Amino acid sequence: MIQPKPCSVLSLDIGDKRIGIAGCDPLGISITHLPAIFRDSFEKDLKEFEKICFDRRVEGLICGNPLDMNGMETKQSIRCKKYGIKLAKCLKLPLAFINEHCSTVEAKEKFSLKNDKTGRIDSAAAAILLQQWLIEGPDLDDSN
């Protein structure tokens, strides 16, 4: 796989209760865990993302896609894709999806976060997705 062009992106681990967030600098060198968003109405979520994107000068979104062990879509992956596409359209940002299978389990082990209800585990999972995207891609797609 070809590495994507580095830029300031947000990586999202979209769950039913929280959205974990991680961001990187424009050169793709450092990854920062950001506070998770506790889900509300889409409009309220959007306002929070608009502020984060403005403050960080975000150029694209990476969304985790929780495929099953065979790489097939699940009910949750369909919900995540719908949310990610809607968010990217509203923010006018290009978007890429990355398979997030087991990212939360990996985050729990890597960062010793168990039984977390604060959203730190979700943002840690988003950071793992972002690290994976910086290495493997795919490129951001602005046709959403």
UniProtKB/Swiss-Prot annotation:
Q: Which UniProt keywords apply?
A: Cytoplasm, Hydrolase, Nuclease, Ribosome biogenesis
Q: Please list the coiled coil stretches.
A: none
GO MF annotation terms: nuclease activity
Q: Please give one Pfam family short name.
A: RuvX
Q: Where in the cell is it found?
A: Cytoplasm
Q: Which GO terms describe its biological process?
A: rRNA 5'-end processing
Superkingdom of the organism of origin: Bacteria
Q: Which GO terms describe its cellular component?
A: cytosol
Concerning CDD domains, the annotation shows:
YqgF
State which Enzyme Commission number(s) the record gives: 3.1.-.-
Family per similarity comment:
Belongs to the YqgF nuclease family.
Query: PANTHER family per the record?
Result: POLYNUCLEOTIDYL TRANSFERASE, RIBONUCLEASE H-LIKE SUPERFAMILY PROTEIN
Q: What does this protein do?
A: Could be a nuclease involved in processing of the 5'-end of pre-16S rRNA.
Protein name per the record: Putative pre-16S rRNA nuclease
Q: What is the organism field in this record?
A: Prochlorococcus marinus (strain NATL2A)
**Lineage of the source organism?**
Bacteria, Bacillati, Cyanobacteriota, Cyanophyceae, Synechococcales
